[in-house]
C-alpha cells in the first residue's frame, strides 16, 4: 500500500531556488515519487511513497519553520501513483497569471466539509467549480457552475465576463485540494466581491469526511496521477485516461471503435493525425514490452502535471 500526499502552502520563499536540490535529494533517498513546485510564493505538489517514506519527507519539510504548520491530505493507492521524482522551480505554484494576487494577505472564508452542504444549498449562493472542464465532466457538486475553462489562467476572464459583485453577493468556490481556490477567492476579493467562500481542504477532504449517503457530490474526482479518479472514501475510481489527449475515459468509451489503448479515444480520434497515431502506437508497444520484462516505462501516458 502506498500513500499519496497532496500539500501546499503560500509562504514567502526568497531562497526557493536553493531549496530545490536538498528537497529533491530527500525525495530520492526515500524513494518518493511525484512532483513538487517551488516558487517565491510557496510550495505545492503531490507525492507518493510508503508510509514511512512520506512521513520522512513531511518531517523534513516541517523542520523548516516556514513549513512547520504545512497541512497535507492523504489518500491510499494500491501502487506507486507516479513514475518520476521532480522538483520544479516556477513563477507561481498554481498559475492564475495575475501577479498581484496574494493569498497570504487576502483570501476567502474557509468552509469546513461538514458545513459545505448547507452553504451550497442556500439559493443566494453562487457555486462555482474552479477546475478545468475535463475535471468537471467527471464529477462535481450539485448545482455547481462550470466556467468551461481549459486552464486556470482562463478563470480571470471568466470572472470578467460573467460575474458582478453588485449582482452576485455570495460566491462559493471549490477545487481538488484547495490551492486553486486560495487564488480564485483572493482574486474575487480584490475585484470587489465581499462574501466569498471556499471549501477547506477541497473536494478530496470532502470525499474523505462526508458519508456518501449525506453527500452532494455527483460522480468521481479527477486527480493528477496514475489513479485518474477517486470516489467517496478516496477509493480509486473507475476511469482510465487516454494518452493522446489526456482526457479521463469511461469503460463504455473504451468500447468505442475510436478507442485504441495509448493511441486514441472518442474525445480525440478526429483531432490527431495519422503520424501522431503511429507515434502513439509505437510508444504503447514500448510500454507493453517494458511490462512484459517486469519493468515500468518511464512515462505511461497518464497525467502528471499540476494545474
UniProtKB/Swiss-Prot annotation:
Keywords: Oxidoreductase, tRNA processing. The active site is at 175 (cysteine persulfide intermediate). The keyword Phosphoprotein does not apply. Pfam families: Rhodanese, UPF0176_N. GO terms for biological process: tRNA modification. Residues 121-215 form the Rhodanese domain. InterPro entries: Rhodanese-like_dom, Rhodanese-like_dom_sf, TrhO, TRHO_N. Belongs to the TrhO family. HAMAP family: TrhO. This is tRNA uridine(34) hydroxylase.
